[in-house]
Each structure stands twice: as C-alpha cells, then as structure tokens.
Amino acid sequence: MASNVVVKDIMQKDVKVVNNNTVMQEVVAIMNKFDKDAILVVQSGKPTGIITVKDVLVRAVEANVPLKTVIARMVYTNPLVVIDENATIEEAAKLMKLWSIKHLPVVDKQGALVGLLDDRAVVYAVPKLMSIMQEFCLRK
C-alpha cells in the first residue's frame, strides 16, 4: 500500500529557505519563529544544502563561534540527498535509512525545490492509510 503513495502527497509544501550567504543568526531566528527543525539552503531555486538543529549545535554553537559571524554555506550538510516528488514513500524511507537522514528535500524534474519530507511524515502516512482502508473494508 505504501508503494502507491507518492512523496508529493505527504510532503511539507511550506518550506522555509535561506541562501548560501544568510547569517546563521537569521537561520536560527527563522527556525524558532516557524518551529522548524530544518531549513533548506537554495541557490536559483535549487537546493544546495540543509541546516538542521543538530548542524547548528555541532558546527556553530559547539565551535563557540558567534552566530552572527557564520553563514549558511559554512554549516549546511552537503552533498545533499534529494528525492523526486513522484517517488513513492517506500523509496523515500529506503533513502532515509541508507543515508541515515531524517529530512529529504523534494524536487521536481528540473531539480527545483517543491517541498520537504521528514521521517515523521513517512511514519504517520502508513498507519493513516491503513486506518482509512480499515474503515472502508468494515463498511462492506
């Protein structure tokens, strides 16, 4: 059943992004304001990196560097693993497991950013689908 659900059906569409030169102080402010645990870094509409809360803590705070002196490209994770919007959630789960990641930027055929998929969305999608099918089957 999960093999029929595509990434674009469950991805976050309201993705917060910054550019390579955004100061980390601003990145953290955006993460706090919108309650995001990951921010994508884009250049010309295409994702170039991702900054997670862990990245902020390990690469900036732990290094004891003032956040106003660090820019996104110094902190973000790269190379970036992305997934096509028409891939199945099963394919997404396999990619997440293979690369030990919790966030997958979602791109269209041209490589432009269209969303973000996180591990929670994948985990919640399968039981939700099972529940819908259970209700359907019980009606008969």
Where are the language model's segments positioned?
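The conserved cystathionine-beta-synthase
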Residues: 17-35, 42, 82-100, 107, ...
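Tandem CBS (Bateman) regulatory domains
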Residues: 1-14, 52-84, 88-97, 116-140
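A glycine-centered beta-loop-beta connector
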Residues: 31-34, 39-54, 96, 104-120
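Short, flexible active-site loop motifs that bind/organize anionic cofactors or intermediates
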Residues: 14-17, 46-47, 82, 112
